Amino acid sequence: LSLAIFDLDNTLLSCDSDHAWGEFLVEQGAVDGDAYRRANDQYLRDYQAGQLDIMAYLSMALKPLSEHSEEQLNAWHQQFMACKIEPHILPQGEELLAWHRQRGDFLLIVTATNRFITGPIAQRLGVDDLIAIEPERENGRYTGRVEGVPSYREGKVTRIRQWLEDQPALTLDDAWFYSDSINDRYLLEEVATPVAVDPDDALRALANERNWRVLSLR
């Protein structure tokens, strides 16, 4: 049983689900449109440059979850899935998941996007488990705070190692990891088979230097 790990945004999806959720909230009038959109765009640029202050970003991104009922959030999420996510699920990404499934591998998505956004996407893609940023909940509502270590950059390695403590049959020693982003270099360096998927320029350069496989799912 080998572990096949996948980044989500711009790897299995041709969009960034976190940024798309921010756009969706603006369209719904759920947040202050111009200010939120400007901040959302800036944080995406910071992420792409490998310079994101994750805690500053999360204080903005998780706040709307604390301001609305779970019922409202779930209704929005269904609309969001239909209009913002389904059109961006890459058919070749689904084929790659199917190939690993056929091999009998354990399919794991690890993402720096929070579980509220990504839980239903992971279910839709049919993976075995999901490691995501965990928004804290109290009494059935989100608090706007984050729980535990954010699964971002080195935090992805930390969270996977914590997760592996409960998975005696699985190891990184024969694992695959697919990602598009230089932010994921730390986990790519830990696995047996790192694969750069439609990589950003910095990851493409690193992949060439390390002789890592480069793949396009588009």
Annotated model-derived regions:
Residues 43-70, 129, 134:
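Short, compositionally biased "basic patch" segments
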Residues 56-92:
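Metal-dependent phosphoesterase signature
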Residues 1-2, 75, 82-218:
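C-terminal cap/substrate-recognition subdomain and adjoining C-terminal extension
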Residues 22-23, 62, 192:
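Amphipathic alpha-helical segments within well-ordered protein domains
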Residues 1-49:
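Active-site neighborhood of HAD-like aspartate-dependent phosphohydrolases
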Residues 16, 68, 155:
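Conserved active-site and cofactor/substrate-binding residues in soluble primary-metabolism enzymes
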Residues 17-24, 70, 133, 146, ...:
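Active-site phosphate-binding/coordination module
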